[in-house]
């Protein structure tokens, strides 16, 4: 069955007229949602801890900032954009005790609703608008008159206006310029986690790291190894984005194509491991492991961060990336992203 996709003419901004939208958190997605909605004429308030370093960022950009409790008490729509592991505490302590009857609760990722960490009462509409790109790209594309695609879902619809509200929000974000694909909280959560763990992060990162180690352990120069297993990956992914796997293949040499076809690194054993990890996502095992570690102060998470931030490939990358003139514009994007992430984003509403 073909996916249902909505575009610009399918959303009605008048649905948000007279309504106040609270954006909880001002990290990567938070700043993009707040600014895009504000520039679309929506009445926006940002909810943050009074001591959050993000308060100054938001105020400098002309946004109204209040505590999470105050913002929640006056909002008709509450978009929760704090990190997954903090959302349930923010909900229990600041949002649920203050939320107006019938106010809508929104998310950009289904994690806490799908796994039951947040359970709004049945009188609250619950919807999702999840951009398929980082916040600084969502903001940049909006400012350029374009948009980043989103996936959208409605989990609770007590009044029957859930989809109209969802599409109005997506339009205000600029997303309907690109398109909004209908999904469910379950599908978005499970596929998003699967993609991160098995392809985008846990797959690609491990391939790059291991490929680099195999070459350098065999005596090849680290700089040459970096070019072959990391640098060229970006160009190949760009070709995939433009024309799929086929364009990436026919853009390469016959030698490269043949090596692709006969490669045995990614095989049926890999598929079985992917299926195992999908099962852990589906049955909630991964979510419980992550949340339990976070509740304990994230000792395992911090240990892994330290371990992988010191991989050998990271000692070579900075020097070589400085050689690429076309990376100069990307540095600005990286700086912008970093200013809204890392320690500031993690501390935003705790």
From Swiss-Prot:
Binding of Mg(2+) 1, residues: 192, 196
Cofactor(s) the protein requires to work: Mg(2+)
One Gene Ontology biological process: L-valine biosynthetic process
Protein purpose: Involved in the biosynthesis of branched-chain amino acids (BCAA). Catalyzes an alkyl-migration followed by a ketol-acid reduction of (S)-2-acetolactate (S2AL) to yield (R)-2,3-dihydroxy-isovalerate. In the isomerase reaction, S2AL is rearranged via a Mg-dependent methyl migration to produce 3-hydroxy-3-methyl-2-ketobutyrate (HMKB). In the reductase reaction, this 2-ketoacid undergoes a metal-dependent reduction by NADPH to yield (R)-2,3-dihydroxy-isovalerate.
Upper taxonomic lineage: Bacteria, Bacillati, Actinomycetota, Actinomycetes, Bifidobacteriales
Associated pathway: Amino-acid biosynthesis; L-isoleucine biosynthesis; L-isoleucine from 2-oxobutanoate: step 2/4; Amino-acid biosynthesis; L-valine biosynthesis; L-valine from pyruvate: step 2/4
Pfam families with a match to the protein in the record: KARI_C, KARI_N
PANTHER family, per the entry: KETOL-ACID REDUCTOISOMERASE, MITOCHONDRIAL
Catalytic residues, chain numbering: 109
Sequence positions that bind NADP(+): 26-29, 49, 52, 54, 84-87, 135
Domain KARI C-terminal knotted: 184-327
Binding site for Mg(2+) 2: 192, 228, 232
Family: Belongs to the ketol-acid reductoisomerase family.
Entry annotated with the keyword Oxidoreductase: yes
UniProt enzyme class: oxidoreductase
Residues of the KARI N-terminal Rossmann domain: 3-183
Cofactor: binding comment: Binds 2 magnesium ions per subunit.
Listed GO CC annotations: cytosol
Protein name in UniProt: Ketol-acid reductoisomerase (NADP(+)) 1
Protein species of origin: Bifidobacterium longum (strain NCC 2705)
InterPro entries linked: 6-PGluconate_DH-like_C_sf, KARI, KARI_C, KARI_N, KARI_prok, NAD(P)-bd_dom_sf
Source organism, top-level taxon: Bacteria
Classification via PROSITE patterns: KARI_C, KARI_N
A GO molecular-function descriptor: ketol-acid reductoisomerase activity
Catalytic reaction list: (2R)-2,3-dihydroxy-3-methylbutanoate + NADP(+) = (2S)-2-acetolactate + NADPH + H(+); (2R,3R)-2,3-dihydroxy-3-methylpentanoate + NADP(+) = (S)-2-ethyl-2-hydroxy-3-oxobutanoate + NADPH + H(+)
């Amino acid at each position: 069955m073909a996916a249902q996709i909505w575009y610009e003419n399918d959303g009605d901004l008048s649905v948000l007229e007279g309504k106040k939208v609270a954006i909880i958190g001002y990290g990567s997605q938070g700043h993009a949602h707040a600014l895009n909605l504000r520039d679309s004429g929506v009445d926006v308030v940002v909810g943050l801890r009074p001591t959050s370093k993000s308060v100054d960022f938001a105020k400098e950009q002309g946004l109204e900032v209040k505590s999470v409790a105050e913002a929640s008490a006056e909002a008709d729509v509450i978009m929760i954009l704090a990190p997954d592991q903090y959302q349930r505490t923010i909900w229990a302590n600041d949002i649920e005790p203050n939320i107006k009857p019938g106010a809508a609760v929104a998310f950009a990722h289904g994690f806490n609703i799908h796994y039951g960490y947040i359970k709004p009462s049945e009188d609250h509409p619950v919807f999702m608008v999840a951009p398929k790109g980082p916040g600084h790209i969502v903001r940049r594309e909006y400012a350029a008159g374009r948009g980043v695609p989103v996936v959208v879902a409605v989990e609770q619809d007590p009044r029957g206006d859930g989809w109209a509200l969802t599409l109005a929000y997506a339009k205000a974000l600029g997303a309907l310029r690109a398109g909004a694909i209908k999904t469910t909280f379950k599908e978005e959560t499970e596929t998003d986690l699967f993609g991160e763990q098995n392809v985008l992060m846990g797959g690609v990162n491990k391939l790059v790291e291991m490929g680099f180690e195999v070459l350098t352990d065999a005596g090849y120069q680290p700089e040459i190894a970096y070019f072959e297993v990391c640098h060229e990956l970006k160009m190949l992914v760009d070709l995939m984005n433009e024309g799929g796997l086929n364009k990436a293949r026919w853009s390469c040499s016959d030698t490269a194509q043949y090596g692709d076809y006969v490669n045995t690194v990614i095989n049926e054993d890999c598929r079985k491991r992917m299926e195992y990890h999908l099962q852990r996502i589906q049955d909630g095992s991964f979510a419980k492991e992550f949340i339990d570690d976070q509740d304990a102060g994230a000792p395992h998470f911090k240990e892994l961060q330290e371990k992988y931030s010191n991989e050998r490939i990271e000692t070579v990358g900075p020097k070589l990336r400085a050689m690429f003139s076309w990376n100069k514009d990307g540095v600005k994007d990286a700086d912008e992203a970093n200013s809204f992430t890392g320690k500031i984003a993690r501390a935003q509403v705790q």
